[in-house]
Amino acid sequence: MTPRTEGMKKISRIHFVGVGGAGMSGIAEVLLNLGYRVSGSDLQQNANTRRLAERGAVISIGHEARHVETVDVVVVSSAVEQSNVEIDAARTARIPVISRAEMLAELMRFRYGVAVAGTHGKTTTTSLTASILAEGGLDPTFVIGGRLNSVGANAQLGQGEYLVAEADESDASFLHLQPMIAVVTNIDQDHMGTYGNDFGRLKDAFVEFLHHVPFYGAAVLCAEDPGVRDILPRLSKPYRTYGEREGVDIRAVGIQRLGLQSRFSVLRQGAEPLEITLNLPGYHNILNALAAIGVATELGVADAVIQRALAGFRGIGRRFQINACLNFGDGEITFVDDYGHHPSELAATLDSARNAWPDRRLVVVFQPHRYTRTRDLFEDFVQVLSRVDVLILLEVYSAGEAPIAGADGRSLSRAIRVRGQIDPIFAETPEEVFDILPNVLKPGDVVMTLGAGSVGVLAQQLPERLGSEAVP
């Protein structure tokens, strides 16, 4: 067992409010494996809460003040309102209430921390980095926002010195972290309410995050992203750049996109070209792999280890996850599930699908996530969703937000219809999708469920339901 940090010796019982989230459950599992007594609450069960309960955590469904009566510290998800009864009770009892990132920072403080930030690609880049280190026998601890298929979990306590984790900019909590290596995959307009709807303030936060890296550490930055390029002149800490353009430190050349894989060579100063086969589709994942290669190069991982890890990478849950292939008429239907919920993510995922299956129709079931995001990026959603062949649009998954007029699923559906490229089908509830799909599917279709909300549950059910009901 890894020793507890000196300050944390005073702590025995740790309670998580909103424990079912990927980031929260991951930290809870690491602390559980370190020997702490972990409890948590959430509004509903999911795979994360069940996994924690199986490993000895005390999980409660629903929030009550009594859940925090005997704990030493309360860790709160950014998705939980500050008026939550458990938070109120903890403060009344003078129990420390901290953010997820504060607890992650404590775990990182006594390890060699690698923090992966960026609007898009954090989970995949963190997973690729952790997989390379594991392949090299470095046994890292990792906390990831999705399930790493090779271990069947989103977190693992390793015995090595490295801790690899996502750094969340959505609530600016990544500013708690003090990593040795920081990665920034991109800087895009999302969660803008945190930054007063000022893109400049968002970029300022990333600069501050990168300045938390010590002078003997390093940053690994994507030079293909305009937001990242904007901040480069402001950085005073060591950094490496990656991308496809000339002049970057870690450069991909000779890119071949081969269906669900990619091949390319990596050029690095003072090193032989590195031939890579990446077991992931999409140009965006080539960039994510370059980031992981940049970290591995900084840590001195052998090239052969990098090659094995990327060629054998088994993917992440809900990141271009192929759930099933079913016989359908004289062809088949392929079911793909992806967490993408921002227009840039949707565009990258759809591009990957078009490249993998250029002659097949894309039937997309999309659930918008948050009314504020739908409002702020409305026209971008209209543009990217108009490119698919068939669109079934669900109502917005609120994530606790109040509805906003003109930013709901029906409004988005109408705007896409007015654009004139496709005629979307609006589904009031996920259950309606089971009735709609059999009437629109054709042999050879690729069904893609996209979004960060409950559409992930629908994605798990579709192959079985349609396999028994929809074959013509």
Curated annotation (Swiss-Prot):
Tell me where in or outside the cell this protein is found.
Cytoplasm
Q: Name one GO biological process term.
A: cell wall organization
Q: State the UniProt keywords alphabetically.
A: ATP-binding, Cell cycle, Cell division, Cell shape, Cell wall biogenesis/degradation, Cytoplasm, Ligase, Nucleotide-binding, Peptidoglycan synthesis
- The molecule here is called UDP-N-acetylmuramate--L-alanine ligase
Task: Tell me what gene encodes this.
Answer: murC
Has UniProt tagged this entry with the keyword Iron? Answer: no
Its family remark reads: Belongs to the MurCDEF family.
Tell me the route in metabolism or biology where this protein functions. Cell wall biogenesis; peptidoglycan biosynthesis
Q: Which organism is it from?
A: Methylococcus capsulatus (strain ATCC 33009 / NCIMB 11132 / Bath)
What EC number(s) does this enzyme carry? 6.3.2.8
Which SUPFAM superfamilies would you find in this protein's record? MurCD N-terminal domain, MurD-like peptide ligases, catalytic domain, MurD-like peptide ligases, peptide-binding domain
Give the Gene Ontology MF terms in alphabetical order: ATP binding; UDP-N-acetylmuramate-L-alanine ligase activity
Which chemical reaction does it catalyze? Answer: UDP-N-acetyl-alpha-D-muramate + L-alanine + ATP = UDP-N-acetyl-alpha-D-muramoyl-L-alanine + ADP + phosphate + H(+)
Free-text function comment from the UniProt entry: Cell wall formation.
Q: Known HAMAP family for this protein?
A: MurC
- Keyword Cell membrane listed? The answer is no
List GO terms (cellular component aspect): cytoplasm
Residue positions binding ATP: 118-124
